């Protein structure tokens, strides 16, 4: 949902939009909670409170102040990610299709012939890093830019088996117009940028597990971050290949040679970062015009020095000349070298050309060896061709996508590789490598071992759920890693499947109860965003590919009402019960009935079950930003930090009742996952709370009334307001608590309206209006370790007779308290108090 804050109402009517006017009788937190549970996508928030907006944004719900009508029109028609610290709105708005354009934030694409293959009458527009160049389009009171591009489709095309780009991009645009927006993927780049800038400033050592190409710009300015990936393809790995011949295959209709060069250089750069943790000088020989340097410059201040007879406009220092092996002495330490020398074929016959290429390959290799033979802190990437070669067995082979697969590949070596054992590799084996293997990632660092790192902050986004990881090892890492942000795939199957298919692999599935964490926040993507100064207009949908975000070691752990809080916890319930269910009271009714409380009078205001816990369990697929386990734990230890607002703390027994209701719901729905989750949450409640039951009581609290509107034959009709199992020495403690609650007890609005047979021979009158105070009293006794209440649900009633009587119904009648007392069962009254 998105909240657009206005000082005055607007005349226009918008689809899927609701107006909420700030309620001055409620505090900012209560207003935020009410807004978050509205069911429409757009909320126009009138007479807004800035504090309420802040609460929503911290909860991951985008809430933006609107000053002008064009701001409202822009934000209401599309989704966006909001940096609420810097006041920047990143639109994810594809309405630019109506201008017959596709967009890119990679400059090199604009220098290709891609426009020849677009839809008729369409053009390509460059919009800069995260749409930065579009800021001029929006003259708003907040900074605004459109981060939507078609780079995802362009890159997917490059790696696909499709050659016809026009058909491919048409299909992708149609998909985009007919399916739900993959909002997490679109906002992820904004999030990653913010995340790693924050972590690098807060932690001396940061480890990142499983980065993919979409992160290749994110880490350019963070050489200190240790990357773990799937490992490189080494020269020695070619021993598994059979010999093949030249295949020749076109991968792309438009020229992607620059993309290949960029990937080669970035792969080399990240190898250097992995070894030396600092920025090198980047030397490049050949590969002009290298327009992609402009893209790199948007993210980092890396220095480029280049040699090529053709211009390289974005180089810091360009030598418009050929580079010879004797020029290697000009290259400094703490550098990387990219050698991409290849003479244009022009009209040379094939045999002569082949001979020239092989000579240049040997020359390129010699330049690399010469460069690596002296000095320190050097990594080289060199252009090779398929031919009989001796190569170091530990050198890394690269074959990033290029316009046509022919006979070229690339080799990365460091100083140690260049001196390592060399192996003869036949031309046919290298053709086999070229024909069958595409390097899919610029990150080729070693795989991560699932072991706790003592001094590092570990980030593993979408990297550990794969079933080639041992599931128990993943759980152990999450439990034991002190500082981390780790995601795992949430189990939102209905049959409690331990693993599910995803693309061509399988992922383990997890629930929050799979982890034993006492200082971690377990939330959703949008809940996580709120902790890093971001919010989002479209919450995660239960697609089957959703992830838990587990943050360990965060200083926000105790801030229970600020982050990963209960905002939106009833939203799914509202959507269902106000549109599909038998009554809008269905949730209240079901919760009472499933706990054998059949008095449904006033059930919506006096419910005996925690609605928060119940909704968090049965609708966990729709809102798992609320960290239920943390909420339970911090209340059980009395460590919850509440910033403000009216805050109701549930008695532990209310939580147990909620689990029982959720279990009943799961059985009716045949939802095995919710069934397990409810059982495990109940077990967790019993683990962190020391709940004892007065099932063999020796004291009780009684309430005697001035008026009983029914006939009775018991000596003193009264309401048993709870039973206790205590020693006589604890009686003063009980009395002290009763005195503390005196005012609240006598303020209870107690009513009765019918009689019924509680069981054979027990005739009783119903009592309403006491449950809220009962549970508060329960909490007070619990905190003093006084056993109060039984394991079965407390059903307030007044015993009238121990014989069969006819049921009576009357108008709701108020019962006035005469006095409240504490009495020993089969003993004397030890305390009483009147108003």
UniProtKB/Swiss-Prot annotation:
Protein name: Protein VP3
Region spans: GTase/RTPase activity: 556-692
Subunit structure: Interacts with VP1. Interacts with VP2.
Family assignment from sequence similarity: Belongs to the rotavirus VP3 family.
Notes on the domains: Contains a bipartite N7-methyltransferase domain, a 2'-O-methyltransferase domain and a GTase/RTPase domain. The C-terminus contains a phosphodiesterase domain that degrades the 5'-triphosphorylated, 2'-5' linked adenylate oligomers produced by the host cell in response to IFN stimulation.
Region described as 2'-5'-phosphodiesterase activity: spans on this chain: 693-835
Catalytic activity: a 5'-end diphospho-ribonucleoside in mRNA + GTP + H(+) = a 5'-end (5'-triphosphoguanosine)-ribonucleoside in mRNA + diphosphate; a 5'-end (5'-triphosphoguanosine)-ribonucleoside in mRNA + S-adenosyl-L-methionine = a 5'-end (N(7)-methyl 5'-triphosphoguanosine)-ribonucleoside in mRNA + S-adenosyl-L-homocysteine; 5'-triphosphoadenylyl-(2'->5')-adenylyl-(2'->5')-adenosine + 2 H2O = 2 AMP + ATP + 2 H(+)
Subcellular location per the Swiss-Prot or TrEMBL entry: Virion
HAMAP family membership: Rota_VP3, Rota_VP3_A
Species the sequence originates in: Rotavirus A (strain RVA/Human/Indonesia/69M/1980/G8P4[10]) (RV-A)
GO cellular component: viral nucleocapsid
Positions of the catalytic residues: 718, 720, 797, 799
GO MF annotations, alphabetized: GTP binding; hydrolase activity; mRNA 5'-cap (guanine-N7-)-methyltransferase activity; mRNA guanylyltransferase activity; RNA binding
Protein role: Multifunctional enzyme involved in mRNA capping. Catalyzes the formation of the 5' cap structure on the viral plus-strand transcripts. Specifically binds to GTP and displays guanylyltransferase and methyltransferase activities. Has affinity for ssRNA but not for dsRNA. Capping activity is non-specific and caps RNAs that initiate with either a G or an A residue. Together with VP1 polymerase, forms a VP1-VP3 complex positioned near the channels situated at each of the five-fold vertices of the core.
Enzyme Commission (EC) number: 3.1.4.-, 2.7.7.50, 2.1.1.56
Keywords: GTP-binding, Host-virus interaction, Hydrolase, Inhibition of host innate immune response by virus, Methyltransferase, mRNA capping, mRNA processing, Multifunctional enzyme, Nucleotide-binding, Nucleotidyltransferase, RNA-binding, S-adenosyl-L-methionine, Transferase, Viral immunoevasion, Virion
2'-O-methyltransferase activity, as annotated region: 246-428
